[in-house]
Regions:
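Short, low-complexity N-terminal intrinsically disordered segments enriched in polar/charged residues
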Residues: 19-57
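A solvent-exposed, acidic/Ser-Thr-rich amphipathic alpha-helical stretch
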Residues: 48-109, 113-119
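A beta-strand edge to alpha-helix "cap/lid" segment located at domain peripheries
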Residues: 20, 92-164
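Cleavable N-terminal signal peptides
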Residues: 7, 17-18
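Positively charged n-region of N-terminal signal peptides that target proteins for export
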Residues: 1-4
Length: 164
């Protein structure tokens, strides 16, 4: 009887721990992956309206470069307007770019959803025929559901290497 009572208490306690956390549906996961894919598409196509639609206004963006690119600099940008301005300014250096973002690992982190995804990106500089840069690393992206859509609240890029 003691074992049964203990087992029952443990089961009820574990249900209570997860009562507030709604599991992600397949539709949620697909929508989250679409946000990540649209991020790459928006940057590559210089579609700043699409880019803006993916984020909350108070987004925090962080770029952590390894020593082979930007000398290992870390950049922190707070707010959507500043983030869009940074992306426009850095995108202006390139004629074209292509972001290949894959292997999204989606998990709950408290109230937020965390997505870790790998990046391999190549950009071709404007006015410098044949000159390009390849950059690889990974993103840690935090999202929340805003009404019916997922939006990014925090986005961090960790550079693992670059080749010019």
């Amino acid at each position: 009887m003691k074992k049964f009572t203990l087992y029952l208490i443990l089961v009820l306690f574990s249900f209570n721990l997860f009562a507030g956390e709604r599991p992600l549906t397949t539709a949620d996961r697909l929508d989250i992956i679409d946000v990540i894919n649209n991020y790459g598409l928006a940057v590559d196509n210089k579609d700043y309206d699409l880019f803006r639609s993916l984020f909350f206004n108070d987004v925090e963006a962080r770029l952590v470069f390894d020593p082979s690119f930007f000398g290992g600099e870390e950049i922190i940008i707070n707010g959507l307007d500043k983030w869009v301005a940074y992306i426009k300014e850095s995108g202006a250096l390139f004629k074209t770019s292509q972001h290949l973002i894959g292997n999204p690992l989606i998990s709950h982190d408290g109230e937020l959803v965390k997505v870790r995804s790998n990046l391999n990106s190549r950009g071709y500089y404007k006015g410098e025929e044949g000159r390009s840069v390849s950059l690889w690393g990974y993103y840690e992206t935090y999202m929340q559901k805003d009404k019916d859509s997922w939006k990014i609240t925090k986005h961090t890029f960790f550079s693992l290497g670059a080749d010019e």
